[in-house]
Amino acid sequence: MSIDYRKTVNLLDTPFAMRGDLAKREPAWVKRWQEEKRYEKLRKLAAGRPKFILHDGPPYANNDIHLGHAVNKVLKDIIVRSKTLAGFDAPYVPGWDCHGLPIELMVEKLHGKDIPAAKFRELCREYAKEQVARQKKGFIRLGVLGDWDNPYLTMDFKTEADIVRTLGKIHENGYLTKGEKPVHWCIECGSSLAEAEVEYEDKVSPAIDVGFKVVDTDKASAAFGADAAGAMAVIWTTTPWTLPANQAVAAGANLDYQLVDTPKGKLILGKDLVESAMKRYGVETYRVLGEAKGQALELLQLQHPFYGRQVPVILGDHVTTDAGTGLVHTAPAHGLEDFQAGLQYKLPIANPVADDGRYKSTTELFAGMLVWDANPRVIETLESHGSLVHKSKLEHSYPHCWRHKTPIIFRATPQWFISMDRKANGGETLREVSQRAVDATEFFPSWGRARLDAMIKNSPDWCVSRQRNWGVPMTFFIHKESGELHPRSAQLLEEVALRIEQQGIEAWFSLDAKELLGEEAEQYRKLTDTLDVWFDSGATHFAVLKQRPELAWPADLYLEGSDQHRGWFQSSLKTGCATIGRAPYKQLLTHGFTVDDKGYKMSKSKGNGIAPEEICGTLGADILRLWVASADYSGDMSLSQEILKRTTESYRRLRNTIRFLLSNLSDFDPLEHVVPLANMVEMDQYALLRAREVQEKVVGELYSRYAFHHVVQEVVGYCSEDLGAFYLDVIKDRLYTTKADSHARRSAQTALYHITRSLLLMVAPILCFTADEAWNVLVDSEEESTLYHIWHEFPAQTVEREAALSSKWQAIRELRAAVNKEIEALRSADKLGSSLQAEVEIDAPAELARHLASLGEELKFVLIVSKADVREAGEVAIRVSPSAHGKCDRCWHYRADVGSHAGHGAVCGRCVDNLDGQGEPRRYA
């Protein structure tokens, strides 16, 4: 009776399927993880370990999550999981930013504007709560592990109270100031904007040259050494609407100016800009009458171009000759540099523009006009007064509101600021403390340091007050006459904070001042301003990290998009330094934006976005997570259907490797079958050494410096080159054809067991679903998780033994690659079938020849040929020829003894021994 030899080989199966079906199966795993309370279990397991705290920058509670959200949360999850596997207690408390204008606008859209303030805030709170639930569902679907049942919300009563306390501490430390300063003002918002709320877009503006007639002719003539009668000092501006607020013309003290006679009259211009100005005016013939330093023009009186008042020439360091005329129109109410110069010269800070962007009723010529509509009227007025020298248009970068995408204005308003340059109680300015804190912070990528440092160096005072309804109130009492804060502000603020803990911000808005001030209430009013939402999120290091027992201050890491250098990173830095004197983080990591395959930023309006929900629903969250990890987040991260296709292919290769490993461990019990390292087949010892080297690089170097795309490259390369193309390829013969319980096979399985554990733990932070699916198969328990363990610990040998192993097997691998090249050449020429049909003769130098010869008959298994002979020679030479022998039906080797064994068909003696005898011994391969 013939034997079916296919049934005699050790081809095992595994419940770990070839196809992941992630999109269908992941939701069930998510549900099971929640039911098992994995996060809570992990906290108990990690209790007592050193902590690693990643503080979540709160996304805004509005609309579904987009791809940028997914990138951010997946990167955070990879870090939290990898730190957990590294032996840390790494809790993750997700958060949401819940106050602010976008929610107000949505509530107005849904319910209208005519709503009582208290009811409006209630509706805002309800809306934010709905949005949090909506986004939470999306983040959980991504496999992000965290305390989803107890997130922090900036609208939590306790958090609102602690935000108020943070403000109080900043006031106590002497950094809070009040003043009328020019701030970014959005007409549509009806509120000031923080730096982080301003975006720059291209805009076409009128560009005009305006003449200010010289009043003090004698002073000007003396300065230029020429007759200046009838001369005009010329400024250039792209904001004609600010001219009603003009109070001076600024010159550079050390810049050279010329008095130029032109067809347009006598003009005073910066020397370096005369030629470009004449070209702009279309003037070909002109004559320089005289020259003077800016210093000589200081306090020269000029006539306002259309009002009756006179304005002086002042000196300012901000004046340059890069463009324009070298003289600068100065309106202290409409620009920060103008404002600073105005303070120095005690100029009026006259703001003619109201909150709605219209000129106040007292503004001569332009009362009631919207500033943008006034530009043509201002130009007409200049023409009628003979003050317009030239007009044109200019496309330039201009600040816009990030919400409305509309141009904003600078206008002086009474606001509250956190001062950057006031020496506070500690004797240092906030700028000094903040710059020292930046120096002490580690940045990923490293260029983030220069960016944040430059922002702190150039940061104006932080305007923290807003004229909004839905926000944390600035809970101060202001004296009605003096405008000063109540002398007991610190005590009163704490009393209010205690009430807010119980009732939320409504405790302040509904508060009768008499409850806290008694008879003093007649002299004080409640401040009605709310805090900038960047202050809310910036204060969460105090409101969350310092208040929750499972967390710690400062955080080890803040991780957000690169736009947060000017946003959350900066607001957190300033509140940390202003309250505690240092940054609330040790490390900052920034990632780029998501772009399409053409490099364009993804957006709904362009229709080039891919929603996380779509990817999870078709391919699975693990594919999305693998793409995030594979992309170099230090720059913009490209995604397209083609990139997703390539990512899916990489995933399949990884999955197939894991499936092969698990299949060949189906009958392996680590408690019973493990072979001690010293007794293992030599190639298996080398495989463990390589696996450990890879893990040490991935864990000790790449994960620790957050180089996830290099983690993926290293792991994929290892699976492809070390495992697929070498080790697994070689040991198939031993796994399949030796006796099931033989030392040779159990040695290979021991190596595979260590490799599988290590590999699954290395990919677990990235492929959280797949790694746990495979882990459950490996340990035969659905209640197990990779996260309940730490990085795999390999058995180790002496340094000398490992060095010898590595040197020997690296040389053998290089020789094997050369043999394969020769075999492939014959196969391409149709002179050879499989590599097992080949017989090989090798000439090699002495050391390599000794390495090869030491394997004896087992060299052929390493080369996957049927015969291999080695001869010492001066250089490597390889000769490959087809075997003349028959093919074994069981192991497919070509041997002389095939078919020569009684009771067996076309099989070789090796297979007969493995079937009926003691089994073949293996020492090397």
From Swiss-Prot:
Motif 'KMSKS' region, residue range(s) on this chain: 601-605
Binding site for ATP: K604
Subcellular location field: Cytoplasm
Molecular function per GO: aminoacyl-tRNA deacylase activity; ATP binding; isoleucine-tRNA ligase activity; tRNA binding; zinc ion binding
Keywords: Aminoacyl-tRNA synthetase, ATP-binding, Cytoplasm, Ligase, Metal-binding, Nucleotide-binding, Protein biosynthesis, Zinc
UniProt remark on cofactor binding: Binds 1 zinc ion per subunit.
Disulphide-bonded residues: none
Enzyme Commission number(s): 6.1.1.5
Catalytic activity: tRNA(Ile) + L-isoleucine + ATP = L-isoleucyl-tRNA(Ile) + AMP + diphosphate
CDD domains, sorted: Anticodon_Ia_Ile_BEm (cd07960), IleRS_core (cd00818)
Domain of life according to the entry: Bacteria
Keyword DNA-binding attributed: no
Cofactor(s) this protein requires: Zn(2+)
One Pfam family this sequence matches: Anticodon_1
BP terms from Gene Ontology: isoleucyl-tRNA aminoacylation
Reported function: Catalyzes the attachment of isoleucine to tRNA(Ile). As IleRS can inadvertently accommodate and process structurally similar amino acids such as valine, to avoid such errors it has two additional distinct tRNA(Ile)-dependent editing activities. One activity is designated as 'pretransfer' editing and involves the hydrolysis of activated Val-AMP. The other activity is designated 'posttransfer' editing and involves deacylation of mischarged Val-tRNA(Ile).
Subunit and partners: Monomer.
Annotated family: Belongs to the class-I aminoacyl-tRNA synthetase family. IleS type 1 subfamily.
Name by which UniProt lists this protein: Isoleucine--tRNA ligase
Source organism per UniProt: Chromobacterium violaceum (strain ATCC 12472 / DSM 30191 / JCM 1249 / CCUG 213 / NBRC 12614 / NCIMB 9131 / NCTC 9757 / MK)
Gene name for this UniProt entry: ileS
